[in-house]
């Protein structure tokens, strides 16, 4: 088996990990969960993080075959369309994204011009589908629970699991977003932990607890033995109770209401209005606020 070379890129503003993996023999590669910079105070976007990826791709002489999303993110904007424009590679996500689009179309009260067929991406992957990056087979695993549409990409010995597992000292991702479900997330995590012990696990977020450096990589064995939420022997009912209690204490992500209306469009910004300006739309009082001191 050819093992992919994996390069990680950390976005400090959102605690998000982005990845480029490639076949060292053919130099073909893919990008996973790229971030578009966004300053909420100024309402401004930038491509600094994506440009770092482009510089790496050019420096390594890679041919990017796919720009991959694991799900529509609630904490950052996707840079997929920008990278597609620069590289010519198609974008892809899991086929259940249509369920997320239907859900959030109602929350944002979007008009019928908003497509809910996933057509904003070049490809919608089904569970169990495979594709090739050079000589490396990439398998798609449906891993819902954090969202309705979450998938993981298993490329050789590397699994890109995004918002399911976190680093072992941080546990697992939340399951309280619209369409989330802790019991379903637990089942998805079990599916990931059924991969071979030495499978490299690359997470989507790390918030550097206790002041350590941000980390992105562990193994299935390490997750099974030491993850604080799901180590061996932790029953699903116990996990659901723990996850639900933990989620009840968490504020919504700072960028959720801004990011999701971009990301259900495949990362495309809203169309300009008559004055040539683009606008975000925020539903007031749709969610419970945090007014604690």
At which residue positions do the language-model features occur?
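Conserved beta-strand hairpin/beta-sheet module of binuclear metal-dependent hydrolase folds
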Residues: 2-63, 152-162
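Active-site-adjacent loop/tail segments of enzyme domains
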Residues: 172-195
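Active-site neighborhood of phospho(di)ester-bond hydrolases with catalytic His/Asp-centered motifs
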Residues: 32, 63-72, 92-95, 143-145, ...
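Divalent metal-coordination and catalytic microenvironments
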Residues: 21, 33, 71, 83, ...
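Accessory terminal helices/loops
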Residues: 2-4, 187-200, 204-293
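Core dinuclear metal-dependent hydrolase active-site scaffold
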Residues: 6-9, 20, 127-155
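Active-site HxH/HxHxD metal-binding segment of metal-dependent hydrolases
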Residues: 36-136, 226
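Active-site environment of divalent metal-dependent phosphoester hydrolases
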Residues: 14, 38-39, 72-77, 98-101, ...
């Amino acid at each position: 088996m050819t093992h992919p070379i994996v390069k990680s890129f950390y976005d400090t503003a959102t605690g998000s990990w982005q990845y480029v993996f490639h076949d060292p023999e053919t130099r073909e590669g893919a990008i996973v969960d790229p971030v578009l910079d966004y300053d909420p105070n100024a309402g401004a976007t930038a491509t600094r993080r994506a440009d770092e990826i482009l510089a790496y791709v050019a420096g390594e002489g890679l041919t990017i075959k796919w720009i991959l999303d694991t799900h529509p993110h609630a904490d950052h904007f996707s840079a997929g369309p920008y990278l597609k424009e620069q590289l010519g590679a198609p974008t892809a996500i899991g086929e259940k994204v249509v369920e997320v689009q239907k859900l959030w179309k109602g929350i944002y009260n979007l008009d019928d011009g908003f497509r809910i067929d996933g057509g904003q991406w070049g490809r919608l992957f089904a569970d169990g589908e495979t594709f090739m990056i050079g000589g490396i087979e990439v398998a798609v695993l449906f891993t819902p629970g954090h969202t309705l549409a979450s998938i993981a990409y298993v490329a050789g010995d590397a699994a890109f699991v995004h918002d399911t597992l976190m680093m072992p000292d941080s546990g697992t991702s939340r399951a309280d977003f619209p369409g989330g479900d802790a019991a379903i997330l637990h089942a998805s995590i079990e599916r990931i932990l059924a991969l071979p012990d030495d499978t490299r696990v690359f997470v989507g977020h790390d918030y550097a607890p206790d002041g350590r450096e941000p980390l992105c990589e562990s193994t299935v064995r390490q997750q099974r033995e030491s993850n604080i939420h799901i180590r061996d022997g932790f029953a699903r009912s116990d996990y659901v109770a723990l996850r639900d209690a933990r989620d009840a204490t968490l504020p919504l992500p700072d960028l959720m209401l801004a990011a999701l209306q971009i990301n259900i469009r495949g990362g495309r910004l809203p169309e300009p209005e008559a004055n040539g300006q683009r606008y975000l739309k925020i539903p007031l009082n749709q969610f419970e606020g945090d007014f604690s001191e």
